[in-house]
């Protein structure tokens, strides 16, 4: 009866070991590891003496276990306690050179997790595509601003108003009908050189007719001609009057000497 129980125990241990080899998981049920000297505890420290288990195995099973590779079966709960007793929870920071050397030395099938400082750019730095950062001081930062003065706007409005008033006055002057210079023409005809005065009077009437028809171009031409003839008539008439006066004075003075 005892031999049957021992054989069942050996079969259970062998199945668990084979399952651990196949899936690579930690055995949480068996706290024993097979070595060349037999089953020994994986916790030889004094604080884990309570976890030691003594089991007997058949000579055949021990001989079969000697040929198998050595395998350690760990308890995750106890392993966590042992790690916490030696290392406190903390973030370990390493430089890039150390991490690179470690990566070259470890096997390709290993996976390790490391925590490094966050190299996020600050408000005074710029990030380039290659991952480098450049620090900017307050003097290097230039902000292009645009200033606008209210007085300049007022001056601009005044200039625009002046320009608009000038253009309006010019437009009004151009739109004004030309003058006929009728009074000047009559004076030149009666009091001055009458042939030119008569021509100026005729052109003044032509100016009025063109304005009545709405032909401002013809009216302006007639008005300029009437003004020119009237002024010329007055000039010639004034010259005639001055000449006559001088001749009369000379004649009278000659008679007095006689």
From Swiss-Prot:
Alphabetized InterPro entries for the sequence: CD225/Dispanin_fam (IPR007593)
Sequence ranges marked intramembrane in UniProt: 229-249
Transmembrane segments: 182-202
Subcellular location: Cell membrane; Early endosome membrane; Postsynaptic density membrane; Synapse
Residues that bear Phosphoserine: 137
Domain of life: Eukaryota
Stretches assigned to coiled coil: none
Membrane topology: Single-pass type II membrane protein
Tissues/organs with expression: Enriched in the cerebellum and also expressed in the neocortex and modestly in the hippocampus (at protein level). Expressed in hippocampal neurons, both in cell body and neurites, however its presence is enriched at excitatory synapses and also found in postsynaptic cells.
UniProt key word Transcription: no
Family designation: Belongs to the CD225/Dispanin family.
Subunit structure: Homodimer. Interacts with GRIA1 and GRIA2.
UniProt name for this protein: Synapse differentiation-inducing gene protein 1
